[in-house]
Swiss-Prot record:
Taxonomic source organism: Verminephrobacter eiseniae (strain EF01-2)
Keywords in alphabetical order: Ribonucleoprotein, Ribosomal protein, RNA-binding, rRNA-binding, tRNA-binding
UniProt keyword annotation of rRNA-binding present: yes
Function: One of the primary rRNA binding proteins, it binds directly to 16S rRNA where it nucleates assembly of the head domain of the 30S subunit. Is located at the subunit interface close to the decoding center, probably blocks exit of the E-site tRNA.
Name this protein carries in UniProt: Small ribosomal subunit protein uS7
SUPFAM superfamilies membership: Ribosomal protein S7 (SSF47973)
Family in the record: Belongs to the universal ribosomal protein uS7 family.
Keyword NAD on entry: no
GO BP: translation
Entries under InterPro entries matching the protein: Ribosomal_uS7 (IPR000235), Ribosomal_uS7_bac/org-type (IPR005717), Ribosomal_uS7_CS (IPR020606), Ribosomal_uS7_dom (IPR023798), Ribosomal_uS7_dom_sf (IPR036823)
Subunit structure: Part of the 30S ribosomal subunit. Contacts proteins S9 and S11.
GO molecular function, one term: structural constituent of ribosome
Any one GO cellular component localisation term in the record: small ribosomal subunit
Amino acid sequence: MPRRREVPKREILPDPKFGNVELSKFMNVIMESGKKAVAERIIYGALELIEKKHPDKDPLEAFTVAINNVKPMVEVKSRRVGGANYQVPVEVRPVRRLALSMRWIKEAARKRGEKSMAQRLANELLEATEGRGGAMKKRDEVHRMAEANKAFSHFRF
């Protein structure tokens, strides 16, 4: 992997319905095999379901709150020191924070039991806004690992 220069970040256009860049990124996370129309249908369907279940809540705000709640602050990275592997807690960069939270929400939604992906996603997002659900469990697990390995934080990268 060449280390010559930093690759410029590609600018992602906001989604057509809400004009939100984060929603557009989430669409790309949900998308499989280049089927953006399917991903779009799933996400907009989930946001409509959120609006139906909670007419008082703005679905876009619920989405943003869910993403922010799931974002991890610290994670562990393996570091080899003197023949032993240590799990060293490190702070998560903001871009990775967003990517991880979106990925965890997607994975948690996939594991749910509801019929359609839109329903699964809507329920996962609603649970994440309330601080529970599979994605929140994953974040708490990562935080617990970092807390348990706090003693190795002096091995920072």
